[in-house]
């Protein structure tokens, strides 16, 4: 928290982007992703104004995204603004055999296809950041939400819009 505050005071940036490495939760009892400890620690120090959660490619049930959002709300203290579906797919068979994480990489068009087919009308949007249209949509969402914060802050301090 002090580190981010120091950057904020020293550089006065318009935006601070914090990427959290590693997994947010275990895959299973063997492949633990360090239990999402790094994500938990960072979430206790810094509350995001906008959050993008990346998920691995899979044919995920729509309800799963809502469950993830609830999990983040209670575990990390913030809600998910949008999901990014990565072009990376978890290779469970090889990972279990080798007791280490293995992934397969896909063409981003395959990810676009599943997003368009299953997730295009969800309350919490699902994007593929490698798709230029999706990238523009994410940027628009960020600007919209952060602009609303700026307006509220001006009203709170008695400033004009």
Per-range role (PLM):
Residues 5, 69, 139-143:
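Generic detector of well-ordered alpha-helical segments enriched in charged/polar residues
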Residues 1-22:
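Conserved nucleotide-sensing/catalytic segment adjacent to the nucleotide-binding pocket
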Residues 125-161:
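NTP-binding/hydrolysis catalytic cores, primarily Walker-type P-loop NTPases
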């Amino acid at each position: 928290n002090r580190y981010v505050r120091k950057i904020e005071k020293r550089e006065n940036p318009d935006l601070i982007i914090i990427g959290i490495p590693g997994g947010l939760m275990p895959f299973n009892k063997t492949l633990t992703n360090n239990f999402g400890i790094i994500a938990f620690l960072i979430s206790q120090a810094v509350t995001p104004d906008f959050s993008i959660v990346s998920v691995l490619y899979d044919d995920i049930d729509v309800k799963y995204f809502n469950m993830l959002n609830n999990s983040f709300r209670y575990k990390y203290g913030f809600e998910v603004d949008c999901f990014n579906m990565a072009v990376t797919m978890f290779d469970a068979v090889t990972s279990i055999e080798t007791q280490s994480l293995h992934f397969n990489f896909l063409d981003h068009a395959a990810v676009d296809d599943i997003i368009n087919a299953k997730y295009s009308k969800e309350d919490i949007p699902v994007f593929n950041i490698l798709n230029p249209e999706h990238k523009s949509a994410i940027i628009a969402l960020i600007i919209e939400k952060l602009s609303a914060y700026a307006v509220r802050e001006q009203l709170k301090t008695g400033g004009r819009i």
